[in-house]
Amino acid sequence: MNPLWQQYIQILNQVVKPALGCTEPIAAAYASAVARTLLGIVPEAISVQVSDNLYKNSMGVYVPGTGKIGLAIAAAAGAIAGNAEAGLEVLAAITPEQVAQAQDLIDAGKVKVERTETEEFIYCCVTLKAGEQEALVKICGGHTLIAEKRLNGEPVFTADNAQSAATGSICDGIDISIKSIYQFAQEVPFDQIKFILKASELNGKLSDEGMAKPYGLEVGRTMKSGIAAGIIGEDLLNKIVMLTAAASDARMGGANLPAMSNLGSGNQGIAATIPVVLTAQCYNVTEEKLARALIMSHLGAIYIKSHYPPLSAFCGNTVTSAAASMAMVYIAGGSFEQSCFAIQNVISDSSGMVCDGAKASCAMKVSTSSSAAVRSFLMALNSQNVSGQGIIATDVEKTIKNIGKMILNGMSSTDVTIIDIMST
């Protein structure tokens, strides 16, 4: 196989993977679970230090299997019941009795959570204590990327600089562009990319769960009620918005089902998957074409997001939906040029959406960006595109660079202000 394509598949396998619950509190649960394996016994006290962005994205979201919100329960649950071998599915097997045990630690004032100053956007340091024993695990640069382990102050593991610098772009040093992604998705042997169909299965189950039960703001179920009442129609646009939002409803509401995530975000994995799957159903395409479209969507989203930090004041569902829209054009038989039009259109439409933490209303943001994806792919099929207006350049690659520049140079103070507001 083309060595470059092997690199693309490696990227996908690295950052498109199942995640149970919002990945920021789950990072704390994972760190706690790893620390517990070092400590060897149930901790008497837990200390958690996190970056501002990880704190922001943990304040308002349910931790799966617990029915509770926040970093304290995530860390306590990880220490009591976490499976350190399960990565982002660390809490998959937690029981009600273990949740109660974790809550007892919190109620006794034995779980402390605080923000810490760090250059890393994803940072979590968990310390467990039991008697004279102490275990520390530090995560840095990625939700499950361990930078350091210590037992009773002695180093057990320290990652080298190259391994721990994951906050840098995952695409650094790789020849990648929208054009090369499009070509790869079209030409790579099908048997090499069948794995991406798991995204359809996992995120589809989350959508079904969100439609069946009252999670969060019930955005998906509310739209279903509107369809049943004849207020809105059940066309492709509304189905995509409804079912994408329903999956996010379930995820943000603590459903005990994993999402297939994209670059550390379950919601963005949902946004990269469900609109593409529903469009494939609408056009009655083959499983192979669906897989190629999902590769286009997920890898396209990863590439665009590699131009800015993994956590910021920018809602990544925007550019994820841009990549989904690109894939939707491909499904509908459009050209590469029209796929680029779709990306331009989505970014022009909804790039002003901010991230003010993970919470139930993320389902509304997912639905907003997904609706933009539908409008944009329809416009693109009609060869209508935004070009040379505002931050949208005449070339899609330049537009992507502009987005990165806007976030890196223009939104850092916005992020500080948002976190300050949320912490007041």
Swiss-Prot record:
MF (Gene Ontology): L-cysteine desulfhydrase activity
Gene Ontology biological-process entries: L-cysteine catabolic process to pyruvate
Highest taxon listed in the record's lineage: Bacteria
InterPro entries: Ser_deHydtase-like_asu (IPR005130), UPF0597 (IPR021144)
Family: Belongs to the UPF0597 family.
The name this protein goes by in its record: UPF0597 protein Sputw3181_2955
Organism: Shewanella sp. (strain W3-18-1)
